[in-house]
């Protein structure tokens, strides 16, 4: 008999399997990102109820399955459902994007307390209030920090020189951040120019985190910050996330 495990985690993804089963991806405190197989989850609500839904924080009892990396889920109890998120399309889009980004940034079976705490903080904010682009930028920056991929936006990534009070700089994902005008010719082809205001906004959100996301950014600055981080993430992930495409479609709903 395999050892019974007790895990506290957040549901990042849930996929129906066959006629009655469900496969979930959890970000857990104890084992990091894991996959779990819930036999009969859709046929009977006795063991799992409605707990195996994205964004749910839960405690799961599970066992390792011989010959498989996937855990067998036996029962779960909900700690926080984040039900407020599901009542508004913009909040669903932001939460889904945050969950997919978290899933892509970490490897299986590696505990990642910093990212889990950040994701719970962000989902808690979405559960309690409206989705805002500044919060999403703060989450992206925090997730990149947790994954060791934080871009340099407070100074030139090449020479370390301070950025001027105004003007524009190049944002080069391959080099890891902004390039001042003298270093800008070394940027990769297609690396965008961004305003000092956008770079400064990203630096502030990087330093203050979600707590600093209450101050609204001017629309043009917000768009530059969004596009710069989107390019950075695509460069490092190697693709555009599916949830990002959905988020772009509902962007006007949150002013993004």
From Swiss-Prot:
<dbReference type="GO" id="GO:0006302">
    <property type="term" value="P:double-strand break repair"/>
</dbReference>
<comment type="similarity">
    <text>Belongs to the RecO family.</text>
</comment>
<dbReference type="InterPro" id="IPR042242">
    <property type="entry name" value="RecO_C"/>
</dbReference>
<dbReference type="InterPro" id="IPR022572">
    <property type="entry name" value="DNA_rep/recomb_RecO_N"/>
</dbReference>
<dbReference type="GO" id="GO:0006310">
    <property type="term" value="P:DNA recombination"/>
</dbReference>
<keyword id="KW-0227">DNA damage</keyword>
<dbReference type="InterPro" id="IPR012340">
    <property type="entry name" value="NA-bd_OB-fold"/>
</dbReference>
<dbReference type="Pfam" id="PF11967">
    <property type="entry name" value="RecO_N"/>
</dbReference>
<dbReference type="InterPro" id="IPR003717">
    <property type="entry name" value="RecO"/>
</dbReference>
<dbReference type="InterPro" id="IPR037278">
    <property type="entry name" value="ARFGAP/RecO"/>
</dbReference>
<protein>
    <recommendedName>
        <fullName>DNA repair protein RecO</fullName>
    </recommendedName>
</protein>
<keyword id="KW-0234">DNA repair</keyword>
<dbReference type="Pfam" id="PF02565">
    <property type="entry name" value="RecO_C"/>
</dbReference>
<dbReference type="GO" id="GO:0043590">
    <property type="term" value="C:bacterial nucleoid"/>
</dbReference>
<comment type="function">
    <text>Involved in DNA repair and RecF pathway recombination.</text>
</comment>
<keyword id="KW-0233">DNA recombination</keyword>
């Amino acid at each position: 008999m395999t050892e019974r495990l007790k895990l506290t985690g957040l549901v990042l993804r849930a996929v129906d399997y066959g006629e009655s089963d469900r496969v979930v991806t959890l970000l857990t405190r104890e084992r990091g990102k894991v996959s779990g197989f819930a036999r009969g989850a859709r046929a009977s609500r006795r063991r799992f109820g409605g707990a195996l839904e994205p964004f749910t924080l839960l405690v799961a009892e599970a066992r390792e399955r011989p010959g498989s990396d996937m855990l067998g889920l036996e029962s779960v109890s909900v700690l926080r459902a984040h039900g407020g998120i599901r009542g508004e399309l913009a909040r669903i889009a932001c939460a889904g994007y945050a969950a997919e980004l978290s899933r892509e940034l970490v490897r299986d079976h590696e505990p990642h307390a910093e990212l889990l705490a950040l994701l719970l903080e962000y989902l808690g904010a979405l559960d309690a209030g409206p989705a805002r682009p500044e919060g999403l930028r703060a989450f992206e920056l925090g997730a990149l920090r947790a994954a060791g991929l934080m871009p340099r936006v407070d100074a030139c990534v090449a020479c370390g020189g301070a950025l001027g009070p105004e003007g524009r700089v190049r944002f080069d994902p391959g080099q890891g951040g902004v390039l001042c005008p003298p270093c800008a010719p070394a940027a990769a082809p297609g690396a965008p120019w961004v305003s000092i205001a956008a770079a400064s906004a990203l630096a502030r959100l990087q330093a203050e985190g979600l707590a600093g996301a209450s101050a609204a950014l001017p629309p043009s600055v917000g768009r530059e910050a969004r596009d710069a981080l989107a390019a950075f993430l695509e460069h490092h992930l190697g693709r555009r996330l599916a949830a990002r495409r959905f988020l772009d479609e509902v962007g006007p709903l949150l002013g993004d």
